[in-house]
Regions:
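Charge-dense, helix-prone N-terminal extensions
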Residues: 1-132
Length: 132
């Protein structure tokens, strides 16, 4: 699942991947726009509480805003609203995950976090190979 998210994230201008405090995250100029981890017992209980799932679960967190954030917040599973940031959104990754939707959400999150110069560069280059 990490590789599938990374396949989109690494096509975005100057994005880079790094190990996070847990899991893997993708960043643009020091801002995290996507983070994949396994929510499990212990110090990650806040993820379990946010998802409502007690077993170890792979999750993606990303940034969203406006109408999209509102729609995702109301959508229910596989989406959940983490409490730690007003723009943070989460998605449980599982067998039935719509990977085209993940690519779109990761790209939108990048647009939210990236400087406008890079967003314009992305707009000129068109959709990522994953979105085509």
């Amino acid at each position: 699942m990490v590789a599938r998210v990374g396949a989109t994230a690494m096509t975005l201008p100057t994005a880079y991947e790094e190990d996070a405090w847990t899991g893997v995250r993708w960043r643009i100029r020091g801002r995290t726009f996507a983070h994949v981890l396994v929510a499990q017992e212990g110090y990650l209980s806040s993820y379990r509480e946010a998802t409502g799932i007690a077993v170890p679960t792979t999750v993606l967190t990303f940034r969203s805003e406006g109408e999209e954030l509102l729609a995702l917040t109301r959508a229910g599973h596989p989406f959940y609203k983490p409490p730690w940031s007003p723009t943070a959104m989460g998605m449980v990754l599982e067998e039935a995950t719509d990977w085209a939707e993940v690519a779109e959400l990761v790209t939108d999150s990048y647009r939210f976090c990236a400087p406008q110069k890079l967003v314009r560069l992305l707009d000129r280059s068109g959709p990522s190979p994953v979105e085509r």
